[in-house]
């Protein structure tokens, strides 16, 4: 008869699993059925009140953050892989204080929503500066006293001016990536500077079969929008200049071709049965004739008959009148600008007079 080792469970024995654990795994799997996109978020260092506020905002966008034990999260994922094999990569990210996030939102929109929900928070000893922490120039909330030497010992140019403690110039107290020590954290707290950012960060999310990490989602939407607009403009210009008609450019291409044909006909002096073209050709020829006649008149007026000489004279007078009108308009605009400037100065002076009696 086989001897059973001491402490070994009997054959066929199944460890008893708490009912709440079974229920938890079942609910996690149901959420994986209900939502298209499944991911993991980092909850480390988030105060409970703020986390509750973030979860409430996300629920309004049909997005659920579900916290559970890492072991149960793994079990739920593993049991769901037959139906949703694309979720398998998430198993590698279940470590530390993470939670599931279930959503039907586009992952980029979700990332933006989570970033917008973040808030500033005081620094704690041991925190790493997310960027240069700058103490700005100007007055502080402190009365003169021992605080001046505390600020100076921390590396801040503090002085007493007009009965107030003042920082005399912008100063980088902690550089990006450096650890914030206890003394510096206390100084920042006293100065009411909250350099840390607290919020939910995406660790990884699977959407439409693709795994996205946080860095994949951190794009500048404004920059991409500008790039898209620039690309659209280049495509529009290419379509017009290469005469490749599209629904958006056909009218412009036809108008451009018409203008170019008109210019060609006018400049080449090609008479065509079109009133606009013939009018432009005749006007151009008339102008060139007057210009040539004017040049001849400067050398020898007697070379022109009276009718042509009178036409040249009228043309010159018209040109002078136009030039004079343009000069008068320019002077009027300058005078108007000067008057507006004087009115603004008078209003400013009146305001100062009212302020100081």
From Swiss-Prot:
Has the keyword rRNA-binding been applied to this entry? yes
Where is there biased composition of kind Acidic residues? 325-348
Q: Please give the biological process terms from Gene Ontology that the record holds.
A: cytoplasmic translation; ribosomal large subunit assembly
Recorded GO molecular functions are: large ribosomal subunit rRNA binding; structural constituent of ribosome
> Quick one: where's region Disordered?
311-357
Q: Which GO terms describe its cellular component?
A: cytosolic large ribosomal subunit
| Keywords recorded for this protein, A-Z | Ribonucleoprotein, Ribosomal protein, RNA-binding, rRNA-binding
Name the domain of life. Answer: Archaea
Partners and quaternary state? Part of the 50S ribosomal subunit. Forms part of the ribosomal stalk which helps the ribosome interact with GTP-bound translation factors. Forms a heptameric L10(L12)2(L12)2(L12)2 complex, where L10 forms an elongated spine to which the L12 dimers bind in a sequential fashion.
> What family, per the record?
Belongs to the universal ribosomal protein uL10 family.
- Annotated PANTHER family: 60S ACIDIC RIBOSOMAL PROTEIN P0, LARGE RIBOSOMAL SUBUNIT PROTEIN UL10
Task: Name it.
Answer: Large ribosomal subunit protein uL10
What lineage, starting at the top, does this entry show? Archaea, Methanobacteriati, Methanobacteriota, Methanomada group, Methanopyri
